[in-house]
Amino acid sequence: MSVKKFIPSFVVCILFCYSLVANELPVAKIIYLNGPSSCGKSTLAKALQESFEDPFLHLGIDKVIDFMPDKINNWEGGYAPLGFSWKADNDATGHPIFHVHAGPFAKRMIETLKMISVLLASQNFNLIIDDVALSGAEVEEWKQLLKNYDVLYVGIVTPLEVLEERERSRGDRRIGSARAQYQTMHKNTSYDLTIDTHAQTTAENVAKIKEALLKKLKK
């Protein structure tokens, strides 16, 4: 057999063997967390990681934004044609709010987060997805994307006054963005579990999520 013929056959053999090994691995377990900025998602995600015996990877939109050059985004109030920036508005009560504006490159990065998540799930990695889906429609897109996997969808709520206080104290958030997200984020969608990061401790919420995930996996 010539070397040229042998190499493709060898590659096919390797890929076939890998597929057999992958099929023997446990199916990926996924926890999808959706909540407004400053609601405590990252703290919760890290606590969940530490609580499981099996490793879970922590993915999120903030991590994807860290891939981007700083100059492409504008978090100070100006317009960023390609990346992320803020769009000023007023809510129904007249309060000033700021919506996230995503330019074409930012939209590609949002889609990249989804593609990375699917790729890792297809390789049987357990995932905790830490998201800021700004509408119920975006959550429904995730549901469609991950429909072939065991996913626990968790909505995170926190009283508006608490979000706004955290927003002010952090100093790295646009004042008014928490209010905008609070008003629209959980509309027109549903979750397997809703938790309040203000009313319950992180440990209590971790226990609730793990219990709900176990019940879902048994169905």
Named regions from a protein language model:
Residues 117-171:
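ATP-dependent NMP and nucleoside kinases share a basic, alpha-helical "lid"
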Residues 50-108:
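Conserved substrate/cofactor phosphate-moiety recognition/catalytic segment
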Residues 42:
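Walker A/P-loop
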Residues 36:
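P-loop (Walker A) phosphate-binding loop of NTP-binding proteins
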Residues 33:
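Hydrophobic anchor at the beta1->P-loop junction of P-loop NTPases
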Residues 39:
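ATP-binding Walker
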Residues 160, 165-211, 215-219:
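Small-molecule kinase domains that catalyze NTP-dependent phosphoryl transfer to phosphate-bearing small molecules
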